[in-house]
């Protein structure tokens, strides 16, 4: 009887694990499909968007709250100030073939959302990316930009948001949605544009009238 009971327990555990695993795989597959469907854009439309980003004039970065800018003040100096938004047109593996975004945390660290969720990464895009845009928002001080970076930092550990049209959730994030959410929630600055419906594409952070470019590569 004991052997039979043990066998039933083991069988139940195995079946339960199998069901959980199957459900997880099914959900992941559906998330992948959602991402591909949402970001299946016309190549010409996509190139026009990045062409608009490349055409943006480059300005000097805003001063710190005390009126002083650390280091060089010339336009097109790679940004290391906390709260500067970074955008690249480079593909991220096969999952996000349409660019990536992050926000500067320190001179050596960014906060970003990758497939594993919100994490910190290396602030070395000037050497590791083929393309890079540094942008900052109109209407905020450098101290407020720092608050936005802190908001993003506080989301570390939250999972990746594969449901790209859902920019309103705060339980999970994709890269450009993370930056969008920080400025929307803190300062009611909407960095989304009319392009790509409700999804927030990384290039929109460059092309929106709410930001201006301080660095390009």
Give residue ranges: language-model regions.
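Bacterial N-terminal signal peptides that target proteins for export
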Residues: 2-10
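Bacterial N-terminal signal peptides
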Residues: 12-21
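Sec-dependent signal peptide cleavage junction
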Residues: 20-36
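Activation targets extended, charge/polar-rich intrinsically disordered C-terminal tails
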Residues: 29, 45-55, 170-217
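Short, basic/aromatic beta-hairpin or loop at an interaction surface
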Residues: 46-66, 104
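Mixed-charge, Lys/Arg-rich low-complexity intrinsically disordered regions
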Residues: 60-78
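Glycine-rich catalytic cores of cysteine/serine-nucleophile enzymes that process amide/ester linkages
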Residues: 78-139, 160-170
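Active-site nucleophile-His-acid catalytic modules used for acyl/amide transfer and hydrolysis
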Residues: 135-195
């Amino acid at each position: 009887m004991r052997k039979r009971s043990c066998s039933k327990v083991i069988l139940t555990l195995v079946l339960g694990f199998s069901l959980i695993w199957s459900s997880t795989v099914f959900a992941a597959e559906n998330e992948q499909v959602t991402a591909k469907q949402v970001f299946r854009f016309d190549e010409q439309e996509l190139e026009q968007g990045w062409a608009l980003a490349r055409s943006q004039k480059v300005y000097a970065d805003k001063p710190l709250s005390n009126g002083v800018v650390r280091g060089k003040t010339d336009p097109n100096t790679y940004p290391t100030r906390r709260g500067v938004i970074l955008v690249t047109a480079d593909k991220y593996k096969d999952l996000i073939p349409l660019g990536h975004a992050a926000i500067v945390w320190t001179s050596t660290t960014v906060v970003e959302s990758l497939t594993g969720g919100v994490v910190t990464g290396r602030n070395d895009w000037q050497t590791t990316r083929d393309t890079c845009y540094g942008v900052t928002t109109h209407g905020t001080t450098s101290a407020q930009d720092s608050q936005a970076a802190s908001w993003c930092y506080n989301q570390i550990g939250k999972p990746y948001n594969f449901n790209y049209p859902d920019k309103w959730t705060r339980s999970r994030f994709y890269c450009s949605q993370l930056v969008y959410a920080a400025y929307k929630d803190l300062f009611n600055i909407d960095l989304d544009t009319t392009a790509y419906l409700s999804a927030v594409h990384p290039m929109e952070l460059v092309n929106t009238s709410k930001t201006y470019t301080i660095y390009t590569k």
